[in-house]
C-alpha cells in the first residue's frame, strides 16, 4: 500500500511540474497587437484607414498601363524587353500570367482587405471612427468598380476572410454592383465624409462629392443613366469644383490639388524613385525616347528623355483636330516637326 501511495504522489508531482512548466512557457508576446485589442482608439482608426490610402496608390501604375494600352488611344513601340512587355497589352497578345494584370488585381484586393478590416474592427463611437468607416466603404466600392469593369465577375469579398474561405468563386455581377451602390450611398448619406469649404480649398481625404462622383460612374457602368445624371449634378451644383483653366499643367506639380481634382493620392517626393512618383512616371513612360529620334542639337531644347511606351494613335490625334480643339491637342500630344530644308534642320 505504501508503494502505491508513493507512486501516486510521484505521478501527481510530475503532472504538477510539467503543468507549471507549460504555464511558464505560455507567455504573451510583447509588442504584438491582435485584431481584437488593437482597433480601440481614434489613433488606431486613423492607422487602419491610412492602410487604404497607402494601398490605393499602388494600383495607379498597373492601371495606367492596362487602361491606356488596351484602349484605342495609344500604342506601344520600341525594342527593349520593357517595351515588348507593353506591346503585349497593346496587341492583346498577353496571357493571364502577365505581370501588370496580376499586380493590379492583387493590389485592388489589398485595398478591399484594408477596407474590410476597418469595417470589421473599427467601432462607431467617435467622429474619427465614423469617418474612417465611411472612407473605407468608398475605397471598397472604388476597388470593385475597377475590378468589375476590367474582370466582370471578380469574387465578392465583404469581410476579412478566414483560412477556410480563401478559395472564392467568381462573383455575381448584380450582387457586386449592389455592394458598390450600397457602400457609396451609405458613405454619402452618413454625413461623416469631409467636404471642401470652397472652390480653392482642397483636402487629400475622401470627400462626399468624390463618393457621389464614383456613384455616378458606377451608375453609368450599370447603364442607369438617369440616376447617374442626378447624382453627378449634385457634385456640379455643390459649387465646390470647376474645370481647371490651366489645362496643360493639369498633370504637373503646378496643377496639384486644383479645383477640378476630386481625389489625389498624397505622397512624398523621392527623386530616386521614378516609378513611385505618379506624375514623374507619366512623363517618363509617355514621352519620346531621345535616343531613337533623328534630329539635330537645336531641337534638344525640347524635353525628350522618356521611354516611349505610350504613343498616341493617329485616330486619337484626328479626334482632337476634328473637334477644332487646339489648346488641348497641343497640351496632350507632343509633335515633332521637320522642315523641307536640305539639311533637314528641325523647326
Model-derived segments and spans:
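C-terminal motif of bacterial Sec signal peptides marking the signal peptidase cleavage site
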Residues: 18-20
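Bacterial N-terminal signal peptides that target proteins for export
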Residues: 1-7
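Conserved, well-structured interaction surfaces
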Residues: 41-60, 81-151, 165-178, 184-198
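Bacterial N-terminal signal peptides
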Residues: 9-16
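An aromatic- and glycine-enriched ligand-binding surface/loop that stacks and positions planar moieties
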Residues: 22-81, 185-186, 205-339
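Single conserved hydrophobic/aromatic residue that forms the stacking wall/gate
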Residues: 337-347
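Short linear capping/connector segments at secondary-structure termini
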Residues: 30-34, 93-96, 158-165, 199-200
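Short coil/turn linking the two alpha-helices of tandem helical-hairpin repeats
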Residues: 148-149, 155, 221-223
Amino acid at each position: 500500500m505504501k508503494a502505491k501511495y508513493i507512486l501516486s504522489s510521484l505521478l501527481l508531482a510530475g503532472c504538477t511540474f510539467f503543468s507549471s512548466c507549460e504555464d511558464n512557457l505560455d507567455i504573451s508576446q510583447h509588442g504584438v497587437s491582435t485584431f481584437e485589442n488593437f482597433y480601440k482608439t481614434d489613433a488606431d482608426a486613423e492607422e487602419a484607414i491610412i492602410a487604404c490610402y497607402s494601398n490605393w496608390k499602388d494600383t495607379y501604375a498597373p492601371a495606367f498601363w492596362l487602361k491606356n494600352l488596351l484602349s484605342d488611344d495609344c500604342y506601344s513601340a520600341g525594342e527593349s524587353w520593357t517595351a515588348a512587355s507593353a506591346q503585349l497589352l497593346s496587341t492583346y497578345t498577353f496571357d493571364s500570367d502577365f505581370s501588370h494584370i496580376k499586380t493590379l488585381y492583387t493590389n485592388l484586393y489589398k485595398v478591399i482587405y484594408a477596407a474590410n478590416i476597418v469595417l470589421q474592427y473599427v467601432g462607431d463611437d467617435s467622429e474619427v471612427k465614423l469617418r474612417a468607416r465611411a472612407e473605407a466603404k468608398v475605397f471598397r466600392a472604388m476597388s470593385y468598380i475597377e475590378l468589375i469593369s476590367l474582370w466582370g465577375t471578380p469574387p465578392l469579398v465583404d469581410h476579412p476572410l478566414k483560412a477556410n474561405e480563401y478559395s472564392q468563386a467568381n462573383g455575381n455581377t448584380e450582387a457586386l454592383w449592389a455592394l458598390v451602390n450600397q457602400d457609396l450611398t451609405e458613405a454619402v448619406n452618413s454625413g461623416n465624409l469631409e467636404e471642401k469649404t470652397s472652390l480653392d480649398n482642397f483636402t487629400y481625404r475622401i470627400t462626399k462629392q468624390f463618393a457621389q462622383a464614383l456613384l455616378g460612374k458606377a451608375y453609368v457602368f450599370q447603364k442607369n443613366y438617369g440616376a447617374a445624371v442626378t447624382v453627378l449634378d449634385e457634385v456640379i451644383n455643390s459649387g465646390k469644383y470647376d474645370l481647371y483653366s490651366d489645362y496643360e499643367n493639369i498633370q504637373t506639380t503646378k496643377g496639384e490639388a486644383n479645383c477640378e481634382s476630386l481625389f489625389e493620392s498624397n505622397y512624398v517626393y523621392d527623386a530616386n524613385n521614378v516609378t513611385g512618383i505618379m506624375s514623374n512616371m507619366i512623363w517618363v513612360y509617355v514621352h519620346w525616347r531621345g535616343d531613337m529620334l533623328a534630329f539635330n542639337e537645336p531641337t534638344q531644347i525640347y524635353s525628350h528623355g522618356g521611354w516611349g511606351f505610350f504613343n498616341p494613335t493617329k485616330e486619337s490625334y484626328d479626334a482632337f483636330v476634328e473637334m477644332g480643339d487646339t489648346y488641348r491637342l497641343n497640351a496632350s500630344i507632343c509633335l515633332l516637326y521637320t522642315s523641307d530644308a536640305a539639311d533637314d534642320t528641325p523647326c
